């Protein structure tokens, strides 16, 4: 689950490729809209890049990851905090009920962006076992330029690591598809930053490169 396109790649791109290699069906739900939204006076109150560019990037990213399907939930970008929470919860819950996922990845609770905060709150309300029994595990990912810029709140402390040593370059290549979000160092979303974070998480977990996650829920059974 990504508040915005590219969050999934920054947060769990390598892990997505590992799921695909294992033969898992992987879906992407993008919470916010690429549409231009206007008020009654025809003034733009919300926009997300150029819609043509964004749709092109989404098409390319779907093919690159070979997602089973991308769900566009069409909530307004940067305005989730003033959008009725029930509407967001309902759209996420409907998506979960359609695909019945076993594992969900979503942002960490420590990101600065309000869209990320609301996405976490809305998604977690859908993960109660009696609402969606298929869910076994829920993990929070970190997003460069959001998670690492929370200098005064709670800090992201990964307690789950996934070895992405064989998929780090593919993660970088996926991020390059988002041309307007990907820039040269020292921009937070750069090749150097992505690789450096993966190497750091790898050094914490005994891998050459890794992605770190915050474990929200684990309902795994012990055989």
Specify the residue positions occupied by each region the protein language model found:
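Metal-dependent de-N-acetylase/amidase catalytic core
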Residues: 1, 18, 22, 45-49, ...
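A short, flexible beta-alpha/helix-coil linker loop
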Residues: 34-36, 75-78
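Short beta-strand segments at enzyme active-site cores
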Residues: 29, 70-73
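ATP-dependent adenylation/pyrophosphate-handling site
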Residues: 1-5, 9-47
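Short, conserved clusters of charged catalytic residues that mark active-site
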Residues: 10-11, 53, 87
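Conserved SAM-binding loop
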Residues: 58-61
């Amino acid at each position: 689950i990504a508040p915005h396109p590219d969050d999934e790649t920054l947060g769990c791109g390598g892990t997505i490729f590992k799921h695909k290699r294992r033969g898992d069906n992987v879906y992407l739900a993008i919470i916010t809209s690429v549409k231009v939204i206007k008020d009654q006076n025809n003034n733009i109150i919300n926009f997300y890049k150029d819609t043509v560019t964004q749709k092109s990037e989404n098409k390319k990213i779907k093919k690159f990851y070979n997602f089973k399907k991308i769900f566009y939930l069409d909530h307004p970008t940067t305005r989730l905090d003033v959008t009725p929470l029930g509407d967001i919860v309902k759209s996420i819950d409907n998506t979960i009920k359609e695909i019945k996922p076993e594992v969900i990845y979503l942002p960490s609770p420590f990101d600065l962006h309000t869209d990320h905060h609301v996405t976490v709150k809305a998604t977690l309300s859908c993960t109660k076992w009696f609402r969606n029994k298929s869910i076994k595990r829920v993990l929070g990912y970190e997003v460069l330029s959001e998670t690492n810029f929370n200098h005064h709140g709670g800090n992201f402390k990964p307690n789950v690591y996934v070895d992405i040593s064989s998929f780090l370059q593919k993660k970088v290549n996926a991020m390059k598809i988002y041309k307007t979000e990907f820039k040269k160092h020292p921009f937070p979303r750069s090749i150097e930053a992505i690789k450096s974070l993966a190497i750091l998480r790898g050094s914490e977990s005994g891998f050459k490169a890794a992605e770190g996650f915050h474990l929200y829920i684990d309902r795994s059974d012990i055989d």
